[in-house]
Amino acid sequence: MHPIKIFDFNLKSDLANWKIINDAVMGGVSASKFYLNTNGNGTFEGNISLENNGGFCAVKHVFEPLILKSVTHFSIRLKGDGKKYQFRVKTHRMDSHSYIFPFPTTTDWQTIEIPITELYPAFRGQKLNLPNYDGSNLEEITFLIGNKKEETFRFLIDSIEAK
């Protein structure tokens, strides 16, 4: 099976369907931005603050539904900053819960392989008593940082695929 491109970043990429969601939605003051750098990589950077019970920044991408029945994993080429992030997916964009996979990063380019069945359901940080993600449908992906500490971060993305 051929890989399913979810997003391939380049200098001409349209970021209109990528949206920042920071802890301001619950009174926090963390700040982040998402843009294309001079090499055409998606760049997610910002500052996490714990003020006002905050502590997270996220960038999400919403798209037309993808059926991933014969797919076994997500493959993400990225360059991190040595910090831990979460990859989140939603079966339907209106779902309140996401399926989550935490992963560490290095300061070098790396490819993270995420087995679909290891994405677990959670809502507001609490694991839910539901089955893990099954790949039947995909309408949203999110990258989130929220390590319960104040920190700056910078995360580059080259490509996101399902294989």
Task: Kindly label every feature range from the protein language model.
Residues 1-163:
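Beta-rich carbohydrate-recognition modules and glycan-binding surfaces
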